[in-house]
């Protein structure tokens, strides 16, 4: 790490922002946060999914990781495919399941690569077609 606590992992820009807290930037397109606790980690959002954020998490910690989506928007949940299980608000569950298909994934990632913010570091030839069924656990308001 340099004096800004920034490093690259698989093209993602990772910055240590506090003790055990990392900001993970997915190619200038999406931002996620990883909080590492004593017995497990928490990943807030999974980004677009153009890159393998799970591999980045594994590079930063060996602890089991709980994954939570802020909402169902693909820029927050496109990387869910890299995990077996995620948590989201109960109203987002149906949408998350519906958008986990090849057509939605490919179209969304291709649109993101055309954005001005995209830094050109993603190689999506292998990742754009990756699809994995994951379990979505509903969270109700007031339960966390």
Predicted regions, residues:
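Short beta-strand segments in beta-sandwich/barrel cores
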Residues: 22, 143-144
């Amino acid at each position: 790490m340099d004096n800004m606590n920034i490093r690259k992992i698989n093209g993602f820009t990772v910055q240590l922002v506090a003790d055990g807290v990392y900001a993970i930037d997915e190619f200038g397109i999406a931002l996620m946060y990883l909080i590492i606790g004593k017995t497990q980690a928490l990943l807030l959002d999974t980004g677009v999914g153009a890159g393998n954020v799970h591999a980045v998490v594994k590079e930063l910690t060996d602890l089991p990781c709980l994954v939570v989506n802020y909402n169902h928007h693909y820029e927050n949940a496109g990387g869910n495919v890299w995990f077996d299980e995620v948590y989201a608000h109960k109203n987002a569950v149906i949408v998350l399941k519906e958008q986990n298909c090849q057509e939605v994934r490919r179209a969304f990632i291709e649109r993101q690569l055309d954005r001005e913010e995209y830094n050109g570091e993603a190689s999506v030839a292998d990742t754009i077609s990756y699809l994995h069924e994951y379990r979505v656990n509903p969270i109700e308001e007031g339960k966390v």
